[in-house]
């Protein structure tokens, strides 16, 4: 066959398209992925038929599917389909704009060549009305650009025989010589139009434009070099001599009107909707997260309206305009993420994010301090000739997720994790050994060396836990000094009070965390005996509800104990119609149980209780459970930590309404910001605090590693757009690598340069104990990753958990499993549907 890579990838696209055709033929309405696959694959088949042009296929692509053949969210998700195919005259790009543009598609064309039966249109339900993913609800009111700047009007005539277009931030005095206007008045001025837009002068055009003064230090650079330097009226005669000498069109304009922006005469005003279409939503606007019912309201925008950093042809970030000139690399950002809506436990705001040396060095307003107001541009956020740009207008940025309950059963889980937005993994294991399939323990020093070395080039921060199940300290110091950043107590190794006490004593000496999976059997004692064994020492309880393991039926009581830092694993997140039914077989496989042994079956069944799973939902919403993690391949799904967190938040909003604001318990905000901040803390800052590395990762804050996830709002929580790891793009949605542009199908999450060679090591951290770092494991193991010690975990309490520090008194009825918190019964119904599911995923 001699297939090249692009052909192999198009085969995968064809398979997805044919799968979509089979689903369509049996009357199913297609989701986003299916619709894209069908349209792109069919376009390629019509290209192969050879009797249609690019223009023909651009039109035909809009005829295949209608609104009744796709799920209600799809027309809002699907704006364009692009694909490249081989015509008789070579490879060409076909772009289908607004591919879902009628109520019904032409199903004969949609199924052409498949030999599948064409279903009757009657099989498809009515279009219906649905809230669309990523919806923005705009604040009322208007935005005045370039407020308080000096302004004037000028008449401009194009004497050229070609059109001339001038961008918003181009120094107007430097404009094309064929434009005739009063250049003396234009000194130190630019167009008063939205940043990144332009005014076009056709040949012979005469227009009156409004100019505003440049901001900042008022230094002109670039253009034609006429007025290079600081704006100084005493040098104006010299500047005008250059204008005349170089033949630049100039004509006095005595009718110019002058004023100040804000007085109404010269103002350029935009409404929030128009503003958002260019730069993304701003203060007061609300964004729907994916297809959930959660709305994030932007609390603050660091932008200076009219001076936004926009990259592209004729845009702002050009030499002498938004990009500064004359600044060395040491004074400028390596990378700037522009106009991002940041969702973090610290708040929901809009800003530029500055990255240097793999770290977040500043958050606020980036740009050129020579032309942008100094109260706006942060001195740490200068954009220069050495700066790369990641345009995040209309996008959401979050901190990279942390999964702190990982069974390292296979290396491929790292690919799934980072593609979902997880950038830090904590857990244990050695591969698909039976011990690892059940417990998160990397037991021996040789295993620890293996795991640190084998994951060294992966673009993910790593931390491994040793086995803590022993009643004597012997052996524990060795694994800690070998690199363990924590210890794990697991019932499959015997989580007895004696082992708990010994493990915690060793952890206290080494300042590391202890994670525990308690005794489901109640063999050595019940939950109160295990709590007593903690002796008020800090401990992190895994899957604190109990379906993942722990004292039956009341391990959930630990969520009300001050020295316990509780977490959940994601198969029970949230409580749905099928949650209970899937768990028995999951548990039997994970813990190496035999369904022919009655006691094994009884053990498994004792862990699965609808009542406590339902209570777990509510405890999360109350902030009484602080973390959500995966339990990867051992009763957990590593690629769904983020998705299931937001599914839980959405279910709770639907069933419990808006959360009261913590500072005003009798009031609720007209948004979901408090709930959103509470839930994002569960997979970012709180696991970082619990594991002792919150100085390095866990939030979008200055000084931390630039581990960032960029999302389209319509895909938030389901599929990221880009994952930045230590300042480098490690993973991103990318189309056909042979294509003329990055967007033709098949678009998929692919590893980027930040994931290859030594880059994965350079942009990531291996977390170890202080003892291991001091012992020099980085050199001993020849690690490329930066090695950092965890710490400050002993003495943590629930009160250290951000936005998740509730301490209710929890009781469980041992017969009915009814859960109460401070005397209130915690009960909710399983949901039959969740967002972030059927609209987005092929299987």
From Swiss-Prot:
Its cofactor is Ni(2+). It is an enzyme of class 3 (hydrolase). Ni(2+) 1 binds at residues 405, 407, 488, 631. Pathway: Nitrogen metabolism; urea degradation; CO(2) and NH(3) from urea (urease route): step 1/1. Ni(2+) 2 binds at residues 488, 517, 543. PANTHER family: UREASE. In the C-terminal section; belongs to the metallo-dependent hydrolases superfamily. Urease alpha subunit family. Homohexamer. Other oligomeric forms may exist depending on pH and presence of salts. This is Urease. The lineage of its organism: Eukaryota, Viridiplantae, Streptophyta, Embryophyta, Tracheophyta.
